[in-house]
Structure formats: structure tokens, C-alpha cells
């Protein structure tokens, strides 16, 4: 849950600090990793791309394939809404205090995230839905999260099956400029 904005950046930064850039590049089969900075949800985020490695974030799947807006998309809230389960809270002032004072319960707390996402998948089958859609459309599973590319390919495949060739998109130059 929220691996793109939390888990992956955390792992990247830890590997970079502890092992260096060369080890970080080993995450990619082609030794090619890149990062970019984006602003979303009112904050700056560092995102990382591991060439040759794809991942699905259940947070993205949930937002894409459920049709009711939630007051919060924190895993704790979604698990309560969908499963009737809540995560246990942090008994310390900070996560660092918890980590240093009671490492075992800190680990158990983090394992809850994995178990809750697993239970959400058991109930909702969003990964299964994503993979089925990707297979049917003959696309990479990450393409299912978009809207335009997925539908373009579905339409193309449908027309191709009927031996209908669609014309190439024409390039046109803009002849006028408009303010705005």
C-alpha cells in the first residue's frame, strides 16, 4: 500500500546510504535506475524507476477500480471500511522510539500492512482484475492503470481482428496562436 511514495523511496535511500549507487543499480536487470521529483497531494515526493522491474501499488489499484470516494485512503481506514479491521496504533511518541524501544512489536505492526493488503486482495481481487484486463488487451499490466492507452489498444485489437486498418494520425501545424 503506497509503495510508490513510501516503500520504494525508503528502500532506495537506505540502499544508497548503506551500500552506494553501484548496489542501487543492481536492482535493475540493466543496471538502470532513475529518479524524479513530483509535487502531489500538497507535498514533494521523490519517485524511482527501476528499468526492467514493474510493480503494482495496491493503493493505485484501489483508487482506480473502486467507485466510491473515501474520506481517507490510508490503509488503516480502507481496511476498516472494506474488512472491518483496524491496525494497532503506535504506543510511543514516534516511530523511531517504537523502533528502538520495542523492535518486535514494531515488526509486527509493519507485518499488519502486508496481511491487510493480502486480505483486501482476497476480498476484492484487484490484482486479478488488473492482470485479466492486461491479458485480454495484450498490454503490460501497468497500462491498465491509465485510461487512454488501454482503450486505444482495445479498439485497435478489435479492429485488427475484423481486418480493419485504421489510418495513421495526421500531424497538423497550428496556424494561429490564442491567448489563454
Name each region found by the language model.
Residues 3-4, 92-93, 172:
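Residue-level "edge-of-site" marker
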Residues 1, 88-90, 131, 169:
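Residue-level detector of family-conserved "landmark" positions at structurally sensitive sites
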Residues 8, 15-17, 21-114:
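Active-site-proximal helix-loop-helix substrate-binding element of RNase H-like nuclease domains
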Residues 96-180:
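Common nucleic-acid-contacting/processivity interface regions adjacent to the catalytic cores
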Residues 13-16, 134:
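Short low-complexity, flexible loop/linker segments enriched in glycine and/or proline
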Residues 1-10:
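Acidic, metal-coordinating catalytic cores used for nucleic-acid/nucleotide bond scission
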Residues 10-13, 119:
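Alpha-helical scaffolding segments of alpha/beta enzyme cores, especially the outer helices
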